[in-house]
Amino acid sequence: MCGIVGYIGDRDCADVLVNSLEKLEYRGYDSAGIAVLENGVIKVEKCKGRLENLRNKMAADGKPYGHVGIGHTRWATHGEPSDINSHPHGNKRVTIVHNGIIENYRQIKEFLISEGYSFVSETDTETVAKLLDYYYTGDPVDTIIKVLAEIKGSYALGIM
């Protein structure tokens, strides 16, 4: 079980996301993270442990600033609790948060490795992020439709 949130608006996105995750923290204590679109670049802050660890990290490193973002609190299902397995996962084009289980992630991961993709985490979520990149056409809706046709399981995704 995980908690996922998204925000688009006029306020400082990082604060809104972290405050929203605080209300969902009971859904996951293993790690927390956010991704914020800052001046056209996706900035990710994430870490192992409770949401307070993320707050402290952003206080030390400087928080991302923007008006669009996604956030996640994690209860680990695939991969141990670690900074690397924390969400969000993604790349320069797409970043995601995920709640649930992708049942066929191993098969998708094997296919993507054969296509030249590499993985850093042990999560099923990273597999979906790479699949979004693989199918990316420039049209987000078309890309998401293709990915949803491939993945099996019970899940919710926040995609940015």
Regions found by a protein language model. Name each.
Residues 1-160:
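Conserved short alpha-helical segments that host acidic/polar catalytic motifs at enzyme active sites
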